[in-house]
Regions:
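Periplasmic c-type cytochrome electron-transfer domains
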Residues: 14, 18-191
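Bacterial N-terminal signal peptides that target proteins for export
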Residues: 2-14
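Intrinsically disordered, low-complexity regions enriched in serine, threonine, proline
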Residues: 1-2, 26
Length: 191
């Protein structure tokens, strides 16, 4: 009987130690995660905002889900290299969304050592020449692509951002009055 009680006690001590260790690891992880800067907060809000699409049903995260390495969340589609529907469910993109987790590492499109490197999209068309960053140029594409978020113009995108809950943050990052939709092309470059 004492041996059973002893084993039970030892099991409880081990379980308790594991729980305390797990709690410590989780709290340490939380402390190690730095707070987002205002521009990072704004980017995160834009990335997850489904209202920035034709039908209010698709965000960047719809096809680049952080939970699955920033690619599409449907494993069957990913396994077969198929495409995802856009904001208009009758239209489909022209390729499976690539993982966006490493996207910031591509650099400017350039010819180096006999090969083209850098840029964004499969064909490098977001070169970085316009905004100085191919990732920033790439991020603009899906909003106006009829196969993706399907908005019709930079003005429509600007108005949707202006109707969002983060206009004060947008002004904090880009300056008061930055969401002037009469200057939608300039606003589009900031989004």
């Amino acid at each position: 009987m004492d041996m059973r009680r002893n084993n039970w006690f030892i099991s409880l001590v081990i379980l308790g130690s594991l729980l305390v260790s797990l709690a410590f690891v989780q709290s340490t992880r939380a402390l190690a995660t730095p707070a987002l800067t205002p521009v990072e907060q704004l980017g995160k809000l834009l990335f997850f905002d489904e209202n920035l699409s034709k039908n209010g049903n698709q965000s960047c995260a719809t096809c680049h889900d952080p939970a699955v390495g920033y690619t599409g969340p449907a494993s069957a589609i990913n396994a077969h290299g198929a495409v995802y529907p856009g904001s208009d469910p009758t239209l489909f993109g022209n390729r499976k969304p690539p993982a966006a987790a490493y996207a910031g590492e591509s650099g400017l499109l350039r010819y180096e050592n006999g090969a083209w490197i850098g840029g964004m999209f499969w064909d490098g068309r977001a070169t970085g020449d316009i905004l100085g960053d191919p990732l920033a140029e790439q991020a603009k594409g899906p909003f106006l692509n009829p196969l993706e978020q399907a908005l019709t113009s930079p003005e429509e995108l600007c108005n949707k951002v202006k109707a969002g809950t983060y206009t004060a943050l947008f002004d904090q990052v880009w300056g008061a009055g930055a969401l002037d939709c009469t200057q939608a092309d300039a606003v589009y470059d900031q989004i």
